[in-house]
């Protein structure tokens, strides 16, 4: 656990723990404070360096490398001689044995020596940690840290505050420089510090400060506590966490766990059959959770269900608790589940990890990812010949030409396009993508043929048989105009180029004779447009659908209803290819097109059945189908397809082409296998070694652990028969050749070196070793085994190199497939991961107990398959204790039959570099264990548990296992017990123990474990009593609990020693006795709730008080909430509540207080229907004294039960403990301070699945030129990039709202109207997979999804500026080119190149000559290998841009100029009509004396008037002015659209030196230049300040109040930028509401006006704002309202803030003022208020991740000090409380004003004590300023959730109080 987090939690507990803790639910005690002495254990350092010490490597029997025992579990060994420089593997062996795998148990440690060196090794037995002196330097013994303080005497560690006496010396048991000491600390308050050594010379206190203050610790109950000291940071902390005994409104995320790969958490592993029970468990910190529920979505029934879980126990060490639920399902389906965990007001969700791979999940504040569970038909199976087969995929045209007579059977391909015939078999396939490039010789048409045919395949059957192939998969072979045949022209015919039906039948027969099965490729989503069915080109007799359409009646064609043809002749086609018209889906399914369904499925000779039995002889037919783009065909079509082919060949393969998770296809009603592209991608990612795009997606390197996680994800999702029959491919006709993926391409001179080939083949062999050793059908793509390489389609379809094969590679494939075929264990043996670390991955396969994974009988056998991607040999030690017994021997069948054996629970294997091993157990070994013991009986005793069981046949001994919870966490406590009885005397009374037993035979074969047996050893409780009497006439009241109630217990041996008897549970029970006189007189009137059964006892824990003789005394109290008689008693148990002993029952009476007035009734609003939740809201009650709380009651038809209580300031509650389809009744009861109760009305609601309003928000690049569309698996818009156009929200945000069913799994992408404009990743790559989301109800039947698009396919580079044909002034000699391109792009601008290191904006300065300048910009990938050297992909990312910029000729001079004339004189002016002219003018200088002086020269050029300031006069005026602002008024210098003031640098310097601002005042605007406004290093001679009037803006939805003012500042000798904002004032006309007026700037990139802000001065008719850049500005009045705020109290402020773009609606028309606002939403509002821009998120908080819509806002707010988080979490999705909102608001107020917080202390609110201590003074200040106000009755409600209306009100208050509105 994170040490900092530990500290934070410790602090938070001490702050919040106010109640005295009750009886301890303790667990197994910690080990003794001082570790048990283990000197008898012999520890050896063993490894690859022992031979240098006169020993043999890995010798566990060595006496040379025995480590010296140093005490307290520490061992040490120093080499007697120096070890040579190099790298070594090592580990620790115990007692000269590998039992348990050594230390560490998984893998070896590495020692790297740069020079010859002595090395010291350390091993800690207690923590099982190992290190060496190259990695670790310990603190010297005399300086070891130790505890000093008042705690010393309490723990028996010397005298208080005396370091020289302290025996609490800390040790570094984990060798991580964190030292620790564990002690049993009695209850009490203590102070302590840590000293280094036995003096005060170096000591550390609170916060790790040297000589710092004492550290406080309050121990509320006796506890074993570990103290920690970090030698690097000097931080000091403990693991102390008070025992959780009640609700603390907190859940410890780090302790939550559910692991789908661990049978303890999910049993059984993987997919389950219908009606099979699956047990799901989740772990939490002990006593942390109030409740746990599971929420799951049924993918078939489309329903979400929530069910409660049961707490089943705790871990053996007492740290964790476990919750469980058992589920079963009566139909095949896919289940998506997550856990809902509650503790008081805190709710957490635990779902799958971010990668959604299963295994260990992740806790979040909101619903995140679901775990997946597949439930399949119990009769689902696959043919045995599929399981473990070796498959071979053939692209017929490129395999072999066996019949030359059909070579030219056709001459035309599609339409009238010719077929390009290749007479040279070794030609490369024509790639029309390369047309126009040097060396291209093709015809540019996608049709070329190499004459391969069915006869050719038949001729090569012997070759395939010799290769080990048992299944052939053929790409399509039916009549088609193309070479790939995925555009079928006639399903009833074999393509003439491939042969005849007779050739087909002969191939089938011949293959079957050789034991080879054949799978056909079926394409039933689309046909060819050049087919007998569509007949677009009229080449076929008969009337095709298109021909009939052309003739005006599509129905005239027998195929007319197969297609959708639009009135303009366009038609639905596959992914936009008009050559592939799609079969119509009628009412959601192609099967509903009757003629199509009959033709393919239903008819006697339907295509699905015919080719499995074409002539009545099954031997002449194919054996199954691979089905193209199956996920683009309705599923019910495939279920009918399955039923049809089952009538011909039962369970014939249906292999789905599905590139992702195909679990929904494998439920048992259709497909029974899938093309396992996931397997391919995982293997490539493990072996690739670099990021690489293979044309189908991006590959990124992973290690062995991630590989295992991914493969396990597939294993757990697929039904076992399907998993063992998956088509595990490394390549196909749709992917780059595997050798080329690994870096070799024979046709590419950059990739065809011998070294590249050798490396690629090594990686291919590695992949094949794992493929051939893994469950499933190992698929070989034709030619891979012969060394064929090639890029993506069409290059991956090269011809087989007959006569030029790589025979060495072929021999490898033959050998490896032979090993697979000859060893059944590699086909159907079970699967277990044995090793997954770094570069090495190893799996185990077993047939044990004479059965394989399917229960089929085979001889016992085992295999270990391992691959090593490292360039160095690896020796791995595999723990086999749970895999196989000792003594089993193996031979490595691919490495010279090297022998291995299991010894001491371990096998040590040498795995060669860049290679692997295939270990097969030697024949004849007995791996069959006895049956597990039965009839296990346990008897609980005092300090012991007795066990007995029945003898198992063949057993020679038994192992005894023990846990604290059923179903797992077992620890072996006894081995090889020879009797059938056992006494466990090593138990602690009062704890739960779970036992299980296994049987072992004489060889060591161990059975599975028996059923669990549970025991509770305990002391017998002899007596309970002395219950004290509560005083009668107890006055009712929320602050009037009973006096303490005492009782005593005696249990001999437990209570008669000093202190609390361990594991004793004491509880006080109390109940209201109805029917009393008080009840009839008062109760029903004042205190009761109608329909509630309160007749039972309520139990609360009692607290240990002390010893009374031999008895232990306990106490508790309660607060009666009804008037009348109450009964109470105490009960005790010391065996976990299995048995209780109770005292006698006593009673007392409760009487009314003076307050007999009931609260007013709350009104409960009718909730809307939601799925799996009920959202309640009510109007608050009032009371003459005060409301205490609200109680929520629920009934499902019977009595009402109280389900929750909320505070008096909360008026809403969400009940998620409901089941869809069940009707519930609710009421809310208001409770006042005397427990007077008033009920609300009753509402009735039935939660049910409802459509969810799903809001997709996407942030796109700011250069996005056109509309954005959402494409994916959406109903009625499947993968249509031109449908579902999104609404533009702002410059780079688009949104669309859809209605989708909850639980729907959506895959999607963003595009801009076509697939040529689809989104890309930051490298410009295709995304490896589609975006995925499960639709859930996030509240109010809504869901919001926030995404980011990084790039667009068609825009590899975008140039913001300059624009082409742009003209610039003559004084501009350089220009900035600003653009945006992808990461890794090589950008060249006018010959200068650079590589873009990140996706996004770049800038580059270019020099300008006078006249026309051509700026040439080129972009291309810097490293083509990142894109697989795919020329098509590289071409997409390559672009040239040329921009013309005209720099004006310098012919008018500068300053006074030779063409200027000047005159001087007071108040003189001259105007002229020439193109140039000059006038000396008087400019009005505003200062205290209001003097006027002549200060410059005016020149006019067209509409541009320039004033050049006289430096001497201007400086004098600046120096002499008494005002801070010196105004140069240029309104009187003449009429012109543009006015320019030239200011020399010495004028600017004078202004800066005198602290004066220069103000340029023009006709419609003024600009103030402060001394540090401009970047001084960019100013050489001075600046030109230009103010240009562009007239009235053309806008809609806004009221224009000013002209457009274009402000620029340029340098006389270069560009000038702003160093800080400058103040600009615009003249405006009168506004209807000045509060809604703001300045906007025009963004030329987006052609949009964007909000800036500003402050209106209505009296002067101006608005002033701070400009951060030069642009065109204008002032608008914007009046924004929403439909749902018409009657809302905050209508005015919401409209004002919306008009100022500070708050936004949930939609364009809905604000939702009463909806609670989240912390992230309020933070975003504050940022907009302060005009703080988002910043790129850098990962400060664990609950915020990059890509979240609020991530960059959180970053900006955090850096600005607006938010703080809680040290780890920002809690962005939590509803913000009123006190949290106030705190953030006041930080913003401080940034708006000069405000400093006063120390006021308490507020004047009536609920001041409810305000958190940290917030009270902040709230007091805010109230004093009038920024916040209380609610009615002077209540602030600090913990109440703030609404969106309240958020708007407080922000408006900030604006108003800071004078900004």
Curated annotation (Swiss-Prot):
The keyword Metal-binding applies. Residues 1-35 form the signal peptide. Residues 1450-1486 have a biased composition (Low complexity). PROSITE patterns: CBM20, FN3, SLH. The record marks 734 as: Transition state stabilizer. Residues 1448-1486 are annotated as: Disordered. Ca(2+) 1 binds at residues 248, 250, 288, 343. It catalyses: Endohydrolysis of (1->4)-alpha-D-glucosidic linkages in polysaccharides containing three or more (1->4)-alpha-linked D-glucose units; Hydrolysis of (1->6)-alpha-D-glucosidic linkages in pullulan, amylopectin and glycogen, and in the alpha- and beta-limit dextrins of amylopectin and glycogen. Keywords: Calcium, Carbohydrate metabolism, Cell wall, Glycoprotein, Glycosidase, Hydrolase, Metal-binding, Repeat, Secreted, Signal. One of its GO terms (molecular function) is alpha-amylase activity. One of its GO terms (cellular component) is extracellular region. It is found in: Secreted, Cell wall. It holds the Pfam family Alpha-amylase_N. Substrate binds at residues 526, 626, 733-734, 793, 797. The lineage of its organism: Bacteria, Bacillati, Bacillota, Clostridia, Thermoanaerobacterales. Its cofactor is Ca(2+). Glycosylated. GO terms for biological process: carbohydrate metabolic process. The active site is at 628 (nucleophile), 657 (proton donor). SUPFAM superfamilies: (Trans)glycosidases, E set domains, Fibronectin type III, Glycosyl hydrolase domain, Starch-binding domain-like. Ca(2+) 2 binds at residues 401, 403, 406-407, 453. This is Amylopullulanase. It comes from Thermoanaerobacterium thermosulfurigenes. Residues 929-1021, 1158-1252 form the Fibronectin type-III domain. Its EC number is 3.2.1.1, 3.2.1.41.
């Amino acid at each position: 656990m994170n040490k900092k987090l530990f500290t934070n939690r410790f602090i938070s507990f001490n702050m919040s723990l106010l109640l005295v803790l009750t009886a301890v639910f303790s667990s197994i005690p910690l080990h003794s404070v001082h570790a048990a002495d283990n000197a008898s254990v012999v520890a050896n350092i063993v490894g690859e360096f022992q031979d240098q010490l006169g020993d043999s490597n890995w010798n566990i029997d060595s006496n040379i490398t025995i480590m010296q025992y140093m005490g307290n579990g520490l061992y040490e060994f120093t080499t007697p001689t120096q070890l040579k420089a190099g790298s070594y593997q090592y580990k620790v062996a115990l007692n000269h044995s590998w039992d348990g795998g050594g230390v560490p148990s998984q893998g070896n440690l590495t020692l790297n020596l740069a020079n010859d060196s002595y090395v010291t090794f350390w091993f800690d037995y207690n923590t099982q940690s190992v290190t060496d002196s190259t990695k670790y330097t310990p603190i010297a013994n005399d300086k070891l840290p130790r505890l000093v303080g008042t705690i010393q005497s309490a723990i028996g560690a010397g005298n208080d505050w005396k370091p020289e006496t302290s025996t609490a010396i800390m040790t570094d048991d984990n060798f991580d420089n964190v030292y620790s000491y564990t002690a049993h600390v009695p209850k009490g308050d203590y102070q302590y510090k840590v000293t280094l050594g036995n003096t005060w010379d170096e000591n550390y206190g609170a916060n790790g400060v040297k000589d710092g203050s004492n550290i406080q610790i309050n121990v509320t109950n006796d506890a074993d506590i570990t103290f920690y000291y970090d030698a690097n940071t000097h931080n000091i902390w403990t693991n102390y966490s008070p025992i959780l005994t009640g609700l603390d409104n907190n859940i410890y995320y780090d302790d939550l766990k559910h692991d789908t790969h661990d049978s303890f958490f999910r049993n059984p592993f993987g997919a389950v059959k219908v009606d099979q029970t699956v047990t799901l468990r989740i772990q939490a910190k002990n006593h942390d959770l109030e409740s746990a529920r599971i929420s799951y979505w049924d993918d078939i029934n489309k329903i979400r269900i929530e069910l409660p879980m049961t707490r089943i126990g705790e871990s053996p060490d007492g740290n964790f608790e476990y919750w469980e639920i058992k589920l079963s399902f009566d139909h095949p389906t896919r289940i998506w589940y997550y856990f809902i965990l509650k503790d008081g007001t805190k709710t957490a969700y635990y779902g799958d990890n971010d990668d959604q791979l299963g295994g260990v999940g992740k806790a979040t504040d909101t619903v995140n990812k679901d775990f997946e569970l597949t439930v399949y038909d119990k009769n689902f199976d696959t043919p045995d010949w599929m399981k473990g087969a070796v498959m071979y995929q053939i692209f017929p045209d490129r395999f072999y030409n066996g019949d030359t007579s059909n070579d030219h059977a056709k001459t035309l391909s599609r339409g009238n396009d010719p077929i390009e015939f290749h007479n040279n078999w070794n030609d490369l396939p024509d790639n029309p993508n390369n047309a126009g490039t040097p060396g291209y010789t093709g015809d540019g048409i996608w049709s070329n043929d190499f004459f391969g045919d069915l006869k050719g395949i038949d001729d090569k059957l012997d070759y395939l048989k010799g290769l080990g192939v048992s299944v052939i998969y053929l790409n399509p072979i039916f009549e088609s105009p193309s070479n790939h045949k995925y555009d079928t022209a006639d399903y009833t015919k074999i393509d003439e180029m491939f042969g005849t039906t007779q050739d087909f039948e002969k191939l089938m027969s011949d293959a079957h004779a050789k034991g080879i099965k054949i799978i056909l490729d079926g394409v039933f989503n689309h046909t060819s447009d050049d087919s007998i069915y569509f007949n677009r080109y009229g080449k076929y007799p008969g009337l095709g659908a298109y021909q009939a359409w052309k003739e005006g009646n599509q129905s005239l064609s027998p195929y007319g209803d197969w297609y959708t043809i639009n009135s303009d002749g366009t038609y639905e086609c596959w992914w936009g290819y008009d050559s592939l018209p799609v079969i119509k889906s009628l009412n959601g399914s192609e099967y509903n097109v009757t003629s199509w369904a009959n033709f393919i499925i239903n008819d006697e000779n339907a295509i699905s059945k015919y080719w499995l039995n074409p002539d009545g002889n099954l031997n002449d037919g194919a054996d199954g189908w691979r089905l193209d783009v199956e996920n683009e065909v309705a599923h019910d079509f495939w279920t009918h397809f399955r039923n049809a082919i089952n009538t011909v060949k039962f369970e014939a393969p249906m292999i789905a082409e599905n590139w992702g998770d195909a679990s929904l296809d494998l439920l048992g009603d259709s497909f029974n296998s899938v093309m396992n592209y996931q397997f391919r991608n995982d293997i490539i990612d493990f072996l690739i070694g670099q990021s690489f795009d293979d044309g189908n997606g991006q590959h990124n390197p992973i290690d062995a652990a991630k590989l295992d996680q991914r493969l396990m994800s597939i294993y757990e999702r697929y039904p076992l028969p399907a998993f063992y029959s998956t088509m595990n491919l490394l390549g196909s006709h749709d992917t780059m050749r595997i050798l080329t993926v690994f870096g070799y391409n024979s046709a590419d001179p950059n990739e065809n070196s011998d070294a590249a080939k050798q490396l690629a083949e090594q990686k291919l062999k590695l992949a094949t070793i794992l493929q051939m050793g893994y469950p499933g059908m190992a698929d070989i793509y034709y030619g891979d085994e012969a060394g064929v390489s090639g890029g993506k389609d069409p290059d991956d379809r090269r011809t087989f190199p007959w006569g030029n094969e790589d025979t060495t590679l072929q021999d490898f494939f033959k050998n490896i497939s032979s090993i697979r075929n000859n060893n059944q264990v590699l086909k159907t043996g079970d699967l277990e991961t044995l090793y997954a670390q770094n570069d090495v991955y190893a799996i185990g396969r077993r047939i044990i107990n004479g059965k394989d994974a399917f229960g089929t009988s085979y001889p016992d056998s085992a295999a270990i398959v391992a691959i090593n991607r490292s360039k160095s040999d690896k020796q791995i030690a595999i723990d086999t204790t749970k895999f196989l017994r000792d003594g089993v021997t193996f031979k490595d069948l691919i490495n010279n039959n090297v022998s291995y054996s299991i010894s001491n629970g371990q096998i040590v294997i040498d795995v060669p570099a860049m290679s692997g091993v295939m270990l097969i157990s030697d024949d004849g070994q007995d791996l069959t264990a006895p049956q597990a013991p039965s009839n296990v009986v346990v008897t609980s005793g005092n300090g012991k548990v007795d066990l007995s069981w029945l003898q198992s046949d063949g057993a020679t001994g038994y192992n005894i296992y023990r846990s604290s919870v059923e179903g797992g966490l077992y620890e072996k406590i006894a081995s090889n017990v020879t009797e059938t009885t056992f006494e466990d005397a090593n138990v602690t009374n009062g704890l739960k123990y779970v036992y299980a037993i296994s049987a072992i035979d004489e060889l060591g074969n161990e059975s599975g474990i028996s059923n669990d047996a549970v025991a509770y050893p305990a002391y017998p409780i002899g007596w309970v009593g002395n219950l004290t009497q509560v005083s009668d006439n107890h006055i009712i009241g929320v602050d009037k609990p009973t006096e303490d109630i005492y009782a005593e217990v005696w249990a001999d041996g437990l209570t008669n020693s000093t202190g609390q008897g361990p594991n004793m549970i004491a509880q006080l029970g109390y109940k209201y006795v109805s029917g009393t006189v008080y009840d009839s007189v008062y109760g029903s009137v004042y205190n009761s709730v109608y329909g509630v059964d309160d007749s039972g006892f309520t139990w609360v824990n009692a607290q240990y008080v002390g010893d009374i003789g031999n008895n232990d005394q306990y106490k508790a109290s309660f607060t009666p909430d009804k008037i009348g008689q109450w009964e109470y008693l105490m009960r005790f148990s010391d065996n976990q509540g299995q048995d209780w002993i109770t005292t006698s029952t006593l009673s007392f009476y409760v009487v009314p207080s003076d307050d007999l007035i009931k609260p007013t009734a709350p009104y409960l609003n009718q909730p809307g229907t939601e799925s799996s939740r009920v959202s309640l809201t009510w109007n608050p009650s009032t009371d003459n004294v005060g409301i205490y709380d609200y109680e929520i009651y629920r009934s499902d038809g019977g009595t009402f039960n109280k389900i929750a209580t909320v505070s008096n300031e909360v008026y809403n509650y969400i009940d998620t403990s409901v089941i869809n389809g069940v009707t519930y009744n609710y009421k809310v009861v208001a409770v006042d301070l005397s427990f007077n109760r008033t009920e609300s009305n009753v509402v009735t609601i039935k939660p049910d699945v409802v459509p969810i309003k799903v809001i997709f928000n996407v942030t796109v690049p700011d250069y996005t030129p056109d509309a954005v569309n959402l494409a994916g698996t959406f109903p009625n818009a499947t993968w249509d990039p031109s449908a579902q156009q999104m609404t533009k929200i702002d410059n780079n945000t688009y949104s669309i709202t859809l209605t989708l069913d909850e639980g729907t799994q959506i895959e999607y992408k963003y595009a801009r109207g076509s697939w040529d404009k689809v989104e890309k990743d930051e490298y410009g790559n295709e995304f490896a997979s589609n975006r995925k989301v499960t639709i859930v109800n996030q509240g109010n039947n809504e869901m919001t999804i926030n995404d980011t698009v990084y790039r667009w396919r068609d825009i590899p580079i975008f140039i913001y500026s300059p624009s082409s044909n742009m003209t610039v002034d003559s004084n501009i000699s350089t220009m900035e080119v600003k653009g945006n391109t992808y990461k890794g792009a090589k950008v060249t601008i006018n010959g200068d190149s650079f590589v873009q290191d990140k996706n996004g904006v770049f800038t580059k300065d270019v020099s300008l000559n006078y006249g026309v300048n051509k700026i040439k910009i080129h972009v291309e990938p810097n490293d083509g290998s990142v894109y697989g050297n795919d020329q098509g992909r590289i071409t997409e990312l390559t672009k040239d841009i040329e921009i013309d910029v005209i720099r004006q000729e310098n012919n008018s001079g500068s300053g006074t100029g030779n063409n200027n004339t000047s005159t001087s004189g007071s108040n003189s002016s001259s105007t002229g009509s020439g193109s140039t002219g000059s006038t000396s003018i008087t400019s009005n200088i505003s200062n205290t004396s209001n003097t006027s002086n002549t200060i410059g020269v005016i020149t006019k050029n067209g509409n541009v008037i320039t004033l050049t300031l006289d430096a001497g006069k201007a400086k004098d005026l600046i120096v002499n002015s008494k005002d801070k602002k010196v105004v140069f008024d240029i309104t009187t210098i003449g009429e012109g659209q543009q006015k320019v003031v030239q200011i020399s640098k010495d004028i600017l310097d004078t202004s800066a030196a005198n602290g004066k601002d220069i103000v340029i005042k023009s006709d419609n605007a003024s600009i103030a230049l402060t001394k540090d406004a401009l970047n001084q290093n960019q100013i050489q001679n001075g600046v030109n300040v230009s103010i240009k009037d562009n007239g009235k803006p053309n806008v809609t939805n806004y009221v224009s109040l000013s002209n457009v003012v274009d402000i620029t500042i340029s340098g006389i000798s270069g560009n000038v930028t702003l160093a800080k904002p400058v103040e600009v004032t615009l003249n405006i006309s009168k506004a209807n509401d000045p509060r809604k007026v703001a300045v906007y700037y025009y963004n030329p990139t987006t052609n949009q006006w964007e909000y800036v802000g500003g402050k209106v001065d209505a009296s002067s008719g101006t608005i002033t704002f701070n400009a951060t850049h030069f642009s065109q500005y204008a002032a608008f009045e914007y009046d924004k309202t929403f439909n749902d705020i018409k009657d809302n109290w905050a209508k005015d402020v919401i409209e004002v803030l919306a008009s100022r773009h500070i708050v936004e609606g949930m939609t364009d028309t809905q604000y939702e003022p009463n909806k609670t606002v989240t912390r992230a939403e309020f933070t975003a509002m504050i940022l907009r208020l302060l005009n703080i821009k988002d910043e790129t998120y850098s990962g400060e908080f664990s609950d915020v991740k990059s890509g979240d819509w609020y991530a960059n806002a959180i970053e900006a707010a955090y850096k600005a000090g607006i938010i703080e988080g809680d040290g780890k979490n920002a809690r962005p999705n939590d509803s913000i409380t009123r006190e949290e909102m106030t705190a953030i608001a006041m930080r913003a107020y401080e940034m708006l004003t000069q405000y400093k917080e006063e120390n006021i202390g308490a507020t004047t609110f009536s609920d001041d004590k409810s305000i958190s201590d940290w917030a009270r003074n902040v709230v007091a200040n805010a109230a004093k300023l009038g920024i916040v106000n209380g609610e009615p009755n002077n209540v602030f409600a600090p913990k109440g959730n703030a609404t969106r209306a309240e958020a708007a009100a407080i922000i408006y208050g900030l604006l108003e109080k800071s004078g900004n509105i």
